[in-house]
Amino acid sequence: MATAIRFALALAWRLSQADRDMKITDVLRAEHAVFHNLFDHIETAVPKLKTMAEVKVLAAAVEKVHAPHSKTEDDLFIEPLEPYFDQMGQQETFHDEHEQIEAALNAVQKARTLKEAKKILLNAITASRQHFDKEERIVFPMAERILKAKTLSELGEQWLCRRQVGK
């Protein structure tokens, strides 16, 4: 957790520097660091939870922060890379994975038993971790090789505008 906090502080400092460009890959890695800390907490907390309401609140919290992250990735990041994903036969993979994670988080709200809700939530967390790992190992490095630094920075600026960070 301390590593993620240091990373988030470093990100905040970089965002405060008007003369520095923030690449979209830097932004997404920072968001992933925060998610991993949230996931660590959920994986520890869920087995101890005693009510459906507790599980549902955690799932809703993850969904609330995951949805804009997924939309940002799809709109600003995956879209410019789609021709390359198409060549690899992976054009729909990342969109589909985002939708599957969102569907799993929504399914927690419809679970009929505490055991089922816990299982669905933990499976959604596992799927998210696997998805993030694929992005961090394959997609982000590929983007940094394929896209120009200026493009990555412009996409980072678009993220700032969407999130209204620093305004």
Predicted regions and their residues:
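Small-residue-biased structural context
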Residues: 4-167
